[in-house]
């Protein structure tokens, strides 16, 4: 399927005014959840990535439907001890400027808890929401506070306020960006 044949509204501002930028052929249909013992040949099919830009808000985005596992996106971003120290040094001025010590922070899509650990080390009361049970278990083994949820579901059930909201390596996978940000 090529861009020209697909009706599409911007994922951020919902404008129908989008410009086709480029179609990129030959990309894998999926990038995770492969079972090498029982290969699913449908996952190995290539697709065309249809890149467009919104004429109203400027967002560059894919017109393709989101992958079925967008709530359970696996990140390869691990943090070495040196990376954690560097991140702590980067975040410390923010924590101090906005008086976040002992204040509540939530990380959306907290993965294995790498960023939660850094927040905790800065004396921020960090809490994560994550959809992957495997990641939740790993985070809880580190004594981190993580619940199973996706942001749009979480806000409907909980009326909590946070002084800081963190979203690393996750926002770009959301199909309804505007709804997600408003949550």
Model features per residue range: what roles?
Residues 2-82:
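N-terminal juxtadomain amphipathic helix
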Residues 20, 26-27, 63, 84, ...:
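Short linear sequence motifs
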Residues 33-36, 75-77, 85, 132, ...:
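Surface-exposed beta-strand edges and their flanking turn/coil or helix-capping segments
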Residues 38-39, 47-50, 79-83, 90, ...:
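Short, surface-exposed, polar/charged, turn-prone segments marking secondary-structure boundaries
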Residues 42-44, 86, 130:
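Short, intrinsically disordered/low-complexity patches at protein termini
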Residues 49-110, 115-122, 127:
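Fe-S ferredoxin-like electron-transfer domains
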Residues 91-183:
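Conserved SAM-binding loop
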């Amino acid at each position: 399927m090529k861009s020209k044949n697909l009706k599409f509204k911007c994922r951020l501002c919902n404008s129908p005014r989008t410009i086709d930028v480029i179609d990129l052929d030959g990309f894998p249909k999926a990038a995770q959840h492969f079972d090498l013992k029982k290969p699913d040949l449908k996952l190995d099919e290539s697709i065309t990535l249809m890149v467009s830009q919104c004429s109203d808000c400027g967002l560059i985005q894919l017109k393709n439907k989101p992958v079925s596992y967008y709530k359970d996106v696996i990140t390869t971003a691990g943090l070495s001890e040196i990376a954690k120290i560097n991140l702590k040094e980067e975040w410390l001025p923010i924590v101090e400027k906005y008086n976040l010590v002992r204040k509540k922070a939530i990380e959306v899509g907290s993965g294995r808890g790498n960023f939660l650990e850094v927040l905790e080390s800065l004396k921020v009361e960090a809490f994560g929401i994550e959809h992957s049970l495997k990641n939740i278990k790993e985070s809880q083994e580190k004594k981190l506070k993580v619940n199973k949820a996706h942001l749009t579901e979480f806000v409907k059930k909980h009326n909590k306020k946070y002084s800081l909201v963190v979203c690393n390596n996750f926002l770009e996978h959301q199909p309804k960006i505007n709804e997600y940000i408003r949550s």
